[in-house]
Regions:
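Canonical Rossmann dinucleotide-binding motif of NAD(H)/NADP(H)-dependent dehydrogenases/reductases
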Residues: 2-35
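Short C-terminal tail/terminal secondary-structure segment
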Residues: 18, 148, 193, 215, ...
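Catalytic Tyr-X3-Lys loop
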Residues: 94, 101-121, 139, 156, ...
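Substrate-binding pocket helix/loop in short-chain dehydrogenase/reductase
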Residues: 99-100, 107-109, 138, 201, ...
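Active-site helix of classical SDR
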Residues: 123, 159, 167
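Alpha-helical segment proximal to the catalytic Tyr-Lys
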Residues: 128, 172-176, 241
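Residue(s) in the substrate-gating loop at a strand-loop-helix junction
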Residues: 143
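Short, small/polar-rich loop/turn modules that mediate ligand/substrate recognition or access, typified
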Residues: 175, 180-182, 243-245
């Protein structure tokens, strides 16, 4: 029996070839039915097709996490298709590698719309659905840069810091409501994903920039999307039934420095 057998999960940003897709596939391989959301519908459909091809169950939807209406739609899709919602992986994010002094107001606000508003809207929409069937687990993907500052991407860092404390606040709120919903955050370090590759390109690319990111982790190399997916699986499963309001750093030692 899988570690999340029979549970229904929503994964945002699930159409990317990074953490979202890998997490969706891992949850499905452990028995979850997965609703894959992504701003790029083709990517979401590709992830769902990969799950179905391996014998799992999945549906896909074009989903803008910065839209409250979009959240109502994806929650309803989960309920209409599978009858319940047990897991929410708030994975979708925007990363612009610029110092704050070089960041435009539009860039700052857009990152907050995706990274902060998206998590806020998602939790508010998912919790009532989870309460219908006795609880659930929310995993918010923050960042190591949400715990310490990051001069090369200040707006991203501040947005992920907001996710960190919003997670703790909602965990306490759910505990007070006694609704059996756990809320935790994961803090990746430098993980080799398309989003990080784009960020490295924004900073000029090349071996020097890659070396800068590799050097952030005392372990001396970039992490993999599966490292994060394994953390999501743990926090979504009953193995973590006494864990809420926690921050799980999967970062090669980045924040230990």
């Amino acid at each position: 029996m899988g570690r999340v057998e029979g549970k229904v999960a929503i994964v945002t940003g699930g159409g990317s070839a990074g953490m979202g897709r890998v997490t969706s596939l891992l949850l499905a391989s452990e028995g979850a039915k997965v609703v894959v959301g992504d701003i790029h519908e083709a990517g979401a459909k590709e992830t769902a097709e990969q799950i179905i091809a391996t014998g799992g169950q999945a549906v896909a939807l074009r989903h803008d996490v910065a839209s409250e209406e979009g959240w109502a739609e994806i929650i309803q899709l989960a309920l209409d298709t599978y009858g319940r919602l047990d897991i929410l992986d708030n994975n979708a994010a925007m990363f612009i590698a610029k110092p704050l002094m070089e960041t435009s107001t539009t860039e700052f606000r857009r990152q907050n719309q995706v990274n902060v508003d998206g998590v806020f809207f998602g939790m508010k929409a998912a919790i009532p659905a989870m309460e219908l069937t006795g609880g659930g687990a929310i995993v918010n993907i923050s960042s190591g840069a949400g715990i310490v500052g990051f001069a090369a991407a200040g707006a991203y860092s501040s947005s992920k810091g907001a996710v960190r404390l919003m997670t703790k606040s909602m965990a306490l709120e759910c505990a007070q409501r006694q609704n059996n919903i756990r809320v935790n955050s994961i803090h990746p370090g430098p993980i080799l994903t398309p989003m990080l590759e784009q960020g490295m390109d924004d900073l000029g690319g090349g071996d020097e920039v890659r070396g800068m990111f590799e050097g952030m982790a005392p372990m001396g190399h970039l992490g993999e999307a599966l490292d994060i997916a394994n953390g999501v699986l743990y926090l979504a499963s009953e193995e973590s039934k006494y864990v809420t309001g926690a921050e799980l750093a999967i970062d090669g030692g980045f924040i230990a420095q």
